[in-house]
């Protein structure tokens, strides 16, 4: 049985409303079309405000990642985050000083750094500082300032002033969107300003973002995408966005 794209879109919206999420692989089988075609459907529906894409599928607006608590965020796309973390670890050397923000992907990165020595971590994330503190050879600096109680990160002028006293060999950021046109973006403006300063205080900037973030533009802009030295992501069908980022000088590595 064949479906018009309009009919398929209607049914996908109904499935999202019923189950809260859909998977690309399951929709591909259901409609007997390629996963590439399903991803294009999801892109259209996301642009219309019906859903948000995540790795391997999409979730309804009532289950947006931005609305999840910290525990839910940590579990979401766990396999993709672990793969990104293992890739990120290859970019880190003993004796590095690393600035990192509050993304849950970076908690996985810290776990992947368990074999490194004499690493200094500067972060505004309580969760990531706690992870880093598990390794005796790591030096951990948790930035002070105002505390976001839901997502456990610090922000504000006190955090920025403290950050500006430090210099890092590398900055690893988790972002909610990256595109050639809109740059690096996050859902919260108080996070974005601090992330911008982390880039300014570091020699090399590494962005770890799964493919659902490619081409995405959310509320708060950090900086131009060209400020990214390395983008670490999982394999994506969004070759158009990948090519645009490469033209800006971003070196892209896929898991």
Language-model segments: residues:
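HTH-adjacent hinge/linker in prokaryotic transcriptional regulators
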Residues: 2-25, 30, 36-99, 110-116, ...
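Glycine-rich beta-strand-to-loop/alpha-helix junction loops that act as flexible
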Residues: 101-103
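Conserved phosphate- and dinucleotide-binding cores of soluble alpha/beta proteins
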Residues: 2-7, 14, 20-27, 32-34, ...
């Amino acid at each position: 049985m064949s479906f018009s794209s309009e009919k398929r879109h209607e049914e996908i919206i109904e499935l999202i409303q019923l189950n809260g999420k859909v998977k690309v692989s399951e929709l591909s089988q259901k409609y007997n079309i390629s996963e590439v075609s399903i991803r294009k459907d999801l892109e259209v529906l996301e642009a219309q405000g019906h859903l948000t894409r995540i790795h391997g599928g999409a979730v309804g607006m009532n289950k947006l990642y931005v609305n999840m608590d910290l525990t839910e965020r940590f579990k979401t796309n766990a396999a993709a985050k672990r793969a990104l973390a293992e890739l990120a670890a290859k970019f880190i050397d003993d004796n590095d000083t690393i600035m990192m923000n509050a993304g849950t992907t970076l908690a996985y990165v810290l776990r992947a750094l368990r074999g490194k020595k004499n690493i200094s971590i500067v972060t505004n994330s309580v969760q990531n500082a706690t992870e880093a503190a598990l390794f005796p050879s790591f030096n951990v600096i948790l930035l002070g300032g105002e505390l976001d109680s839901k997502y456990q990160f610090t922000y504000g002028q006190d955090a920025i002033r403290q950050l500006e006293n430090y210099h890092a060999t590398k900055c690893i950021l988790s972002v909610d969107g990256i595109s050639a046109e809109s740059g690096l973006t996050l859902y919260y403006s108080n996070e974005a300003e601090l992330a911008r300063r982390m880039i300014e205080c570091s020699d090399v900037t590494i962005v770890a973002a799964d493919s659902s973030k490619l081409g995405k533009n959310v509320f708060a802009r950090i900086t131009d995408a060209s400020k990214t030295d390395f983008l670490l992501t999982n394999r994506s069908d969004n070759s158009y966005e990948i090519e645009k980022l490469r033209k800006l000088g971003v070196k892209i590595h896929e898991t």
